[in-house]
Amino acid sequence: NEKPAFLIHTGDICYEPGLTIHNQVVNAQTMDCPVYYCIGNHDLVKGNYGEELYESLYGPTWYSFDIGNVHYVVTPIDHGDNPTNYTQKDVYNWLKNDLALIKKDQALILFNHDLFTPNDSFVFKADDDHLLDFRSFNTKAQIYGHMHYNYVRNQNGIYTICTGTLDKGGIDHSPSSFREIKVDANDNITTQLRYAFIEPQIAIVSPMNNQTAAACTITEDQLPVSVNTYYSQAKTSHVSYILSDSENNQEIAKGDLASRTD
C-alpha cells in the first residue's frame, strides 16, 4: 500500500515448487506493481537445460529496464544445480550491447543472484578477452541474494546489498524481513529493512511503572509521553493520544505525538 516502483526477488525462488507458486501469488496483478525476478542457482532445475522452467514461467533470464534516471540490469547466475543453456560469453555480449545504449551519466543498478566481486574491482568477466568494467559507468549498486543474509557495504562508492529470506530470516540468524531501497532525484541510495509478519502494534515506553523518560527537558507540570509503533505493511503516519484520570476516566489532555525516528 506504499506504491513501490517495483518489487524484485533476487533468486532462489526455489526448485520446481517455489518457481511455480511464486509465479501464481507474487506477480504484477497480485502486488499491484511491476514484479521482477532473478534466477538463482537453486532455480536451475532438471529439464532440457537448467533455466527451461524459469523461462517458461518468468521469461528471459537477463533483461533491463529504466525507471526515472536509473537503468536497472538483471543478469543470471553463472552456476547452479543443473547446466545452463547460456554461457558467460552470451551474457557478456548482451550486456555490452545493452550498456552501450544507456544515456550519458545515467545511473546504473545491477541485479544478480550472486555477488559479482568481493573486492572493489566490479568487472564482469566472461574470459580474459571479454571484460566489462562497471566502474566506467555511473554504477550505484549491485543487489544480490545468494548469501541469504542482511548485509550492506559501500565498496568504494558502489553499494553491495544483500537481504535474507523473507519467510524464515537469514543464514546470519537475522529475523524475517524484506528490504526497502530508495533512489532519490540525485540517484543517491538509501535502504532499510522492514521486519515481516508483524501486525499493527504499539507499546508505551513512557510513562511506565511510575517512571518517565529522562532524555528530555520538562517542567514540573509536563509529562513526557513516548511510544513505539510497528507494522510490517505500512509505516506509522501519526500517533494520537488521550490522557485521562484512572479513577473517573475524565480527560486531562490529548494531542498528537511528534515522530522522533523513522
PLM region descriptions:
Residues 10, 101-119:
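Short acidic, glycine-rich surface-loop motifs adjacent to enzyme active sites
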Residues 110-115, 140-150:
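Histidine-centered catalytic micro-motifs
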Residues 19-104, 128-141, 149-184:
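Extended active-site neighborhood of metal-dependent phosphoesterases/phosphodiesterases
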Residues 11-12, 40-41, 113, 145-146:
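Active-site glycine-centered loops adjacent to acidic/histidine catalytic or metal-binding residues
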Residues 226-230, 234-262:
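Long, low-complexity serine/threonine/glycine- and acidic-rich segments characteristic of extracellular
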Residues 1-21:
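N-terminal active-site segment of His-dependent metallophosphoesterases
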Residues 7-9, 37, 110, 143:
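Residue-level marker for buried hydrophobic side chains located in beta-strands
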Residues 158-231, 237:
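Binuclear metal-dependent phosphoesterase catalytic core
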